[in-house]
Amino acid sequence: MEEAFQSDYKKRGCRWAGAVSLPPLPKDALVLETGCGNGKTLSAFSCRAVGVDISSEAVRLAGAKNAVAGDVRALPFSDSVFDAVFCWHVLGHLMEADRIKAVSELFRVTKPSGSVYFKAFSASDFRFGKGTEVEQNTFLRGDGMLTHYFSVDEVLSLFGDGEVFENNWSMRIRGVEHPRSEVIGIFPKNRF
């Protein structure tokens, strides 16, 4: 996985563009963005933010002093540090056992009063089924990118109690409409 991202960032530079819509957070909040990539979302936070990405090339492109190379399965941070942890379109690039490890790490670095914010593609997305299926609902594309497509129930099973919903929209590509779909969730650490 790391090699695929390193290669792609070196070849294309910026992978994702577009406006970022963030939930309101207190100005004094400390936020972690996992999979910070080129820093697009990291730079949009109006509070203190730290980014981590498996690709050192992405971290270099982000040009941010507050971004480090690291793995979401073994985050290089102490316990209970962040008020909010964002994991947007990261877990879908992992196999099931690694997704479970990563979720444990996300909660480990979140303060007891904090929350984990999740977003990933759902099985309703038009790209579902493209590539070679390597696990249920997980596909390996020709460029080496692994993508898992989630269901709401799967996300609840992975994270536990929280607010989860599916967001559907349409994207026009070369004059043809394609269905896009994400599962989005917010999971307070202190759920009990």
What spans do the regions from the language model cover?
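Class I (Rossmann-like) S-adenosyl-L-methionine-dependent methyltransferase catalytic domain
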Residues: M1-A74, D98, S115-F192
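A short acidic, Gly/Pro-enriched loop at the edge of an enzyme's catalytic core
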Residues: R73-V85
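A short beta-strand submotif of the Rossmann-like class I SAM-dependent methyltransferase core
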Residues: C87-V90
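A short His-aromatic
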Residues: G92-L94
